[in-house]
């Protein structure tokens, strides 16, 4: 028997009513748990194989149709799947010319490293710099070697050993950059999963203040993580789902974050129903029916929003969007099946020491959220105008964004390859360590070489290699400027224009500079393509869920405003606190998709409850009751989600750290400003017209 009337069961979709009876049913709960145990036992070992299908090649992070990506594909023809990548050892003195002992050291290193060089290749150097303060060895290595990483480490060990006093030695070049990147990504997904799991556990303990209850959402999220890894592995292996190490790492954070959010919301509603129903199975059945539509709509919005990234040109964006959508769906399945089953098996005692007693009222009406609602009711228009003004001021900071990280700026701590690049830039033509690559028909090689040599910004051009059939040749083009500089990117544009004009050459220009240029342009294009689609999808979901046109438009406007506020606040943190010189090119798009999808998440939870309460008590009381009822749980969910993304901010890659900071700030802004003040005050000011054209009831 209920303490107050609730909407009849018939208001909920029949499929949802049927689903709700299974996980919380007297028999169904055992079937659900048995099914999950079988799935985990049978497929669990596949979760550990996800790393086997991750693609860490350069093309995994490039626009799929970019010219630089085509060059990387063409280069595979030169030695099968093997690629010659040079390691560059730099021996330098800051305030003096190199000595004979320094030259002898570099010469001895050349001899010691000769055994690492693949057949047909040779070590170049020691090459002195024009200022006489540095020497350089270029050691070609092959990615086809089983010991590629060990070979690079040997180069570093040999170069660093027995160096004369005052001689600085660093090994970088493309091989050094590749290995440093691999080391960063090596255990990224495992590290993120363990760190996120620890954060979620601590926050659940604080939220529930129970020695037992936290175990059930944590265990359910663990099931979701295993299922996510298994499904992602199978889709990658058999359906060509693109997965890179970065997306695999963020995937675990997303699953833990949204999975815990859904657990918090379901448990909060279950606790309410336990106050009204003596039978825990009936309480769970009703909790699923009444919270299910919001949770499913939320997960659907996030999953579809992330899936919109499949329209992006940049492969890493497509990867994160698609695997993220898989993770959200798996998290949803776990939270609406295994979690209710676990809670239905155990009963009320898991809430100890705060056990919900049958026949008593929940404390929502006496919480701080009820008092906040009362304050908003007095001056709703002033409240939302003030909130919009403050958020808009934050957003103004986003107008000063500097986009595009250089190679040296990609890491929070400088790896050796970055140090080597800095030394090279100080003493040699800046592009010498990482030249552009031109793939051309051999018959047109000389014409292309002549055209490339005449380009402003090109230091030198020399033939490098040809395919076994002799049809294709590569040219190494050293630029005047550092590979990641704006001047080098402009030179690549001029180089492309020049070589493309050579008839029947089919010339393609790639290399690091070309990759950076192509990625930046694709990121700008992706913004124009993906953002309108995401907004349209989210709007349609809100219209279907709330059966209104006004409310969805208002809610969408609030999350867009929140995104720009978060972007501005993040820019201040990046420049004033963290000393990041620029934002990663992909950050605006990734941040927008995550924050719009996750931000609308909390609006869905709030407004579905407001509509439910408004149908019973009228619009104004419904808004206040909805805020009071959901305030605590949505705040907890927001803190959990922000904390999980904060874990990403501790990663060594600046691009990931920036994503973690932006999403974390955005979620907190949505939680404490948009959902707490802006949306309720707008709903109170607009009144029942917010539900137009539908009627409550």
Model regions and ranges:
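Structured non-transmembrane domains adjacent to transmembrane bundles in polytopic membrane proteins
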Residues: 64-86, 93-178, 402-582, 604
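Short hinge/gating elements
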Residues: 56-58, 406-407
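Membrane-embedded transmembrane helical bundles of large multi-pass transporters/channels
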Residues: 1-54, 119, 143-403, 513-697
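Short, conserved active-site loops that position catalytic residues or coordinate cofactors/metal ions
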Residues: 51-55, 86-93
């Amino acid at each position: 028997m209920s303490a107050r009337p609730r909407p009849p069961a018939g208001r909920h979709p029949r499929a949802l009513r049927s689903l709700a009876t299974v996980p919380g049913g007297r028999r169904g709960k055992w079937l659900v748990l048995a099914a999950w145990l079988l799935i985990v036992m049978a497929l669990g070992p596949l979760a550990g194989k996800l790393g086997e299908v991750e693609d860490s090649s350069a093309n995994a992070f490039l626009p799929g149709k970019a010219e630089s990506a085509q060059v990387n594909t063409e280069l595979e023809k030169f030695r099968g799947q093997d690629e010659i990548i040079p390691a560059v050892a730099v021996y330098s003195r800051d305030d003096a010319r190199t000595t004979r002992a320094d030259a002898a050291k570099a010469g001895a290193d050349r001899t010691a490293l000769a055994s690492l060089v693949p057949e047909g290749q040779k070590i170049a150097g020691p090459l002195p710099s024009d200022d006489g303060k540095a020497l350089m060895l270029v050691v070609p290595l092959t990615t086809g070697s089983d010991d590629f990483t060990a070979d690079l480490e040997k180069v570093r060990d040999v170069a660093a050993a027995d160096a004369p006093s005052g001689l600085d030695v660093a090994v970088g070049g493309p091989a050094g950059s590749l290995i440093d990147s691999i080391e960063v990504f090596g255990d990224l997904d495992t590290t993120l999963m363990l760190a996120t799991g620890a954060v979620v556990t601590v926050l659940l303990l604080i939220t529930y203040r129970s020695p037992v209850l936290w175990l059930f959402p944590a265990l359910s999220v663990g099931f979701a993580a295993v299922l996510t890894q298994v499904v992602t592995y199978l889709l990658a292996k058999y359906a060509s789902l693109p997965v890179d190490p970065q997306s695999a790492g963020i995937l675990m954070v997303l699953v833990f974050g949204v999975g815990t959010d859904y657990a918090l919301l379901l448990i909060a509603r279950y606790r309410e129903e336990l106050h009204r129903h003596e039978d825990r199975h009936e309480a769970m059945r009703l909790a699923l029916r009444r919270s299910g539509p919001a949770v499913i709509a939320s997960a659907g919005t996030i999953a579809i929003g992330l899936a919109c990234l499949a329209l992006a040109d940049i492969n890493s964006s497509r990867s994160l969007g698609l695997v993220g959508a898989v993770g959200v769906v798996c998290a949803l399945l776990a939270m609406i099946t295994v979690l209710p089953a676990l809670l239905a098996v155990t009963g009320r005692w898991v809430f100890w020491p705060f056990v919900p007693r049958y026949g008593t009222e929940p404390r929502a009406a006496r919480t701080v959220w009820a008092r906040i609602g009362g304050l908003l009711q007095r001056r709703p228009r002033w409240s939302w105008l003030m909130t919009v003004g403050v958020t808009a001021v934050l957003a103004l900071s986003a107008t000063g964004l500097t986009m595009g990280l250089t190679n040296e700026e990609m890491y929070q701590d400088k790896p050796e390859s970055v140090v080597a690049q800095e030394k090279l830039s100080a003493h040699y033509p800046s592009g010498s360590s990482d030249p552009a690559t031109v793939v051309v028909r051999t018959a047109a090689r000389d014409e292309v070489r002549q055209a490339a040599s005449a380009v402003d910004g090109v230091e030198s051009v020399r033939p490098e290699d040809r395919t076994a059939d002799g049809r294709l040749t590569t040219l190494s083009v050293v630029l005047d400027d550092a590979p990641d500089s704006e001047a080098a990117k402009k030179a690549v544009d001029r180089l492309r224009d020049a070589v493309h004009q050579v008839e029947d050459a089919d010339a393609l220009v790639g290399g690091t500079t070309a990759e950076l240029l192509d990625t930046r342009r694709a990121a700008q294009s992706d913004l124009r393509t993906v953002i309108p689609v995401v907004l349209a999808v989210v709007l349609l979901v809100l219209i279907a869920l709330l059966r209104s046109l006004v409310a969805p438009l208002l809610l969408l406007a609030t999350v867009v405003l929140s995104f720009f506020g978060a972007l501005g606040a993040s820019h201040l943190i990046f420049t004033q606190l963290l000393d990041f010189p620029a934002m990663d090119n992909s950050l605006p798009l990734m941040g927008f998709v995550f924050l719009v999808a996750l931000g609308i998440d909390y609006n869905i939870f709030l407004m579905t409850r407001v509509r439910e309460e408004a149908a019973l008590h009228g619009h104004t009381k419904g808004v206040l009751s909805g805020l009071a009822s959901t305030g605590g749980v949505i705040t907890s969910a927001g803190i959990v989600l922000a904390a999980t993304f904060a874990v990403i901010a501790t990663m060594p890659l600046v691009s990931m750290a920036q994503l973690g900071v932006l999403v974390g700030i955005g979620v907190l802004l949505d939680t404490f400003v948009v959902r707490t003040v802006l949306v309720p005050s707008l709903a109170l000011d607009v009144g029942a017209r917010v539900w137009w054209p539908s009627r409550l009831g």
